[in-house]
Design a protein with these regions (language model features):
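Catalytic phosphate/metal-binding cores of nucleic-acid and nucleotide-processing enzymes, i.e., regions
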Residues: 1-118
Length: 118
């Protein structure tokens, strides 16, 4: 099992939707920037040749954002894993499942625990 921490708050679904509503380029720019930020941490992971399961542990600094909006950011994380060459694809053949847990702390972050399955 591999574990990494992304030590900052990722955009929520509402934030992403608001960017996309501005114009098609704003949403794409946001995603590109988030992918680059996440990529630094994703590059510490090995390449996965077998399917994986991921546990996302979300730490939020306050209770303002709905949990479903928070965990939307897994889309950014999985896309970054594919872009970095850590996963061949993020479809069901390669990502067999995931779960989410949440807590509140001093600073926002997400901790990933990734397990290869056969």
């Amino acid at each position: 099992m591999n574990k990494i921490e992304i030590p900052f708050r990722l955009p929520s679904l509402n934030q992403y939707i608001n960017e996309c509503r501005k114009n098609k380029f704003a949403g794409a720019k946001m995603k590109k920037n988030v992918d680059a930020d996440i990529g630094y941490f994703i590059n510490k992971l090995p390449k996965y040749n077998n399917p994986i399961k991921i546990h996302f542990h979300w730490v939020e600094e306050n209770k303002r954002r709905d949990l479903d909006n928070v965990c939307f950011a897994k889309k950014f994380i999985l896309d970054s894993m594919v872009k970095a060459g850590k996963l061949k694809d993020d479809n069901r053949n390669y990502v067999k499942g995931f779960n989410d847990t949440f807590e509140y702390g001093k600073t926002s972050k997400v901790i990933l625990e990734i397990e290869e399955v056969k």
